[in-house]
Amino acid sequence: MELVNPGYGSGFTFKLTKWKNIKRGYTHFADGDIAFAKITPCFQNRKSVIFKNLPSGIGAGTTELKVLRPYYRQMSHEYILAFLQSPYFIDEATFKGTANQQRIVSGYVENKLFPLPPIEEQQRITKRLEEISKMI
């Protein structure tokens, strides 16, 4: 989880390793996938990412990542990421588990209402969010 940057944005770093070492016991993802932390406090710290430019096009990470793979072409990856980092998504989550190992409840993402405007509006929103974040 330490390789995914907290806060708004989509920064991450990676380590190269042999696939046989990470084939099992890890969450797998590919270029274009969007992932977010499902464990506290990383979830509240908005640890989320759009995976881009992975050396082999695929990767593996902690099992504490929830990976989303948008198939619908009319969905902006940046818009989805902004939604995942929004107070609406973060603040309304409920958790389950022990005090030190709480995770978002199963089905939270699948049952969350997702506002989906036309692609042009998604792009306008994410462009404006980028402009505002540069001012902060």
Whereabouts are the PLM-identified features?
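Catalytic cores of nucleotide-enabled group-transfer and carboxylate-activating enzymes in metabolic
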Residues: 46, 70, 74, 83, ...
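A structural micro-motif recognizing beta-strand termini
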Residues: 53-54, 69-71
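A short glycine-rich beta-alpha junction/loop motif
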Residues: 58-66, 98-117
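DNA target-recognition patches
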Residues: 1-22
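Short Ser/Thr-interspersed hydrophobic loop/turn segments at strand-loop and sheet-helix junctions
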Residues: 3-9, 26-48, 60-65, 72, ...
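Short amphipathic alpha-helical coupling segments at ligand-binding clamshell hinges
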Residues: 76-83, 121, 128
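Amphipathic alpha-helical coiled-coil/heptad-repeat segments
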Residues: 91, 111-136
